[in-house]
Amino acid sequence: MNYEGKTKIVKVTGDYALLEFKDDITAGDGLKHDVLTGKGSICAETTAILMKYLSEKGIKTHLVEYIPPRTLKVIPLKMFPLEVVVRLKKAGSFVRRYGGAEGEDLPVPLVEFFIKDDERHDPMVCVDHLEILGIATKKQAEKMKEAAVKITLALKEFFERANFELWDIKYEFGLDKDGNVVLGDEISPDTFRLRKKGEIFDKDVYRRDLGDPLKKYREVLELCRSLNSQ
């Protein structure tokens, strides 16, 4: 069984699945779209490094192994049709909804749930919505929330070693064959905001037409390689 999304192709092969990263980059619910040669391999390796780091911290991910240049061998998950966002600072849609200045600290990590639905612009929902709509139970939602905060704080610590600031990050979770909530999808500049002294190292470079996003993605990969080897 194969499935192709905006930025990845999933191929289920027996007990495992292959997650192939494409060179596509999108923004605005897919309305903005380009192909950047080499992006897929950058995001695949970045994800592999960061998920391996999380596994060493005792956090469950779907990663089994990285198959260069652009493929991850993963545990198949029954994915929740959700994006789970953790915010450490005000940015993006949070500022549009609630105001404030980009980069302002939030007093505690803020967790938000969004239904994956481009046509409805990924509506934000609360835990009660998830249960009423049959998307996830309250217990599953709490497990996702707990894991998302734990992962975010671990990644924040990882990047702080090089004086980079993790502003916010988006996750996707699923259930393994035993019903455990497990981190799936990817962790890359496609899914987080990463800054250093005002410089942007994430997809906002593409969203805002601020230069060459591929250059910044490469720099993040080099950063992850360097920190991983320490």
From Swiss-Prot:
GO molecular function, one term: ATP binding
Pathway: Purine metabolism; IMP biosynthesis via de novo pathway; 5-amino-1-(5-phospho-D-ribosyl)imidazole-4-carboxamide from 5-amino-1-(5-phospho-D-ribosyl)imidazole-4-carboxylate: step 1/2
Gene3D superfamilies, alphabetized: ATP-grasp fold, B domain (3.30.470.20), Phosphorylase Kinase, domain 1 (3.30.200.20)
TM helices/strands, residue ranges: none
Disulfide-linked positions: none
Biological process, per Gene Ontology: 'de novo' IMP biosynthetic process; cobalamin biosynthetic process
Superkingdom field: Bacteria
Catalytic activity: 5-amino-1-(5-phospho-D-ribosyl)imidazole-4-carboxylate + L-aspartate + ATP = (2S)-2-[5-amino-1-(5-phospho-beta-D-ribosyl)imidazole-4-carboxamido]succinate + ADP + phosphate + 2 H(+)
EC number(s) per entry: 6.3.2.6
SUPFAM superfamilies: SAICAR synthase-like (SSF56104)
Keywords: ATP-binding, Ligase, Nucleotide-binding, Purine biosynthesis
Family designation: Belongs to the SAICAR synthetase family.
Full protein name: Phosphoribosylaminoimidazole-succinocarboxamide synthase
Species annotation: Thermotoga maritima (strain ATCC 43589 / DSM 3109 / JCM 10099 / NBRC 100826 / MSB8)
Species lineage: Bacteria, Thermotogati, Thermotogota, Thermotogae, Thermotogales
